[in-house]
Amino acid sequence: AMNAGGKKAVLWGTALDNLAWWKMVDPDGNWLEVERLNHNFGKIHEQERVEFRLKRFDPSGQKLLSESVLSMPGASCRKTGLGKDVTDKFLGGLPGVQKEGTDGIIVAARWVLHKMPPISRTVCLEFFGQVREAVPAIVEITDYFKPGGAGHAAGVQLAGLEHLDERYVKAVGYATKAKRHGRPKMVLIGDIVGHDEKAVMSAASEVVRMCNLRAAEGFIAV
């Protein structure tokens, strides 16, 4: 199960965070069922310890061969700052989610599903200044919605944040929305969600204002 999640991973995590149970067949033809115990229904690294029950069955799927519990610190599943540790391919030996190689084929899975808040606004932010001045905006935006930030206090969340660098912008032939000549150095596309329309619009406007201070122009899709 690759560490997929798309831009909504900002709010709800990736595939690894939302797996509740999966069944796979190993190279010997035996069956393996993996169940996440005491799921926190959030990001895996935010849980102090994560546990998985592993049940192995014979090829018929009827005879239980072994049962064990795999336990590891939640923080070990994701590298601080980077978001994912590309150097850790093993992930504590958790079957089916290693980042390299194949230890089996997943044939069934159960997932944690999340309900999207009813109010959503998308902001498009185009940065025309130096890249070194634009990149800190990513941290400033995410901090605004974290606990302690004004966005979080208003009950508004950042559901997604997509980063397009200069090479990507050029490769896809990005059409600049601002009334400027040339393409931006960086583009951020964010989804801001909540239950109060006024609070969501206020947060979206504040994000645009923050980015205006970094030589960016912002647009809110209504």
Q: Locations of the language-model features?
A:
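FAD-binding subdomain of flavoenzyme oxidoreductases
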Residues: A1-V139
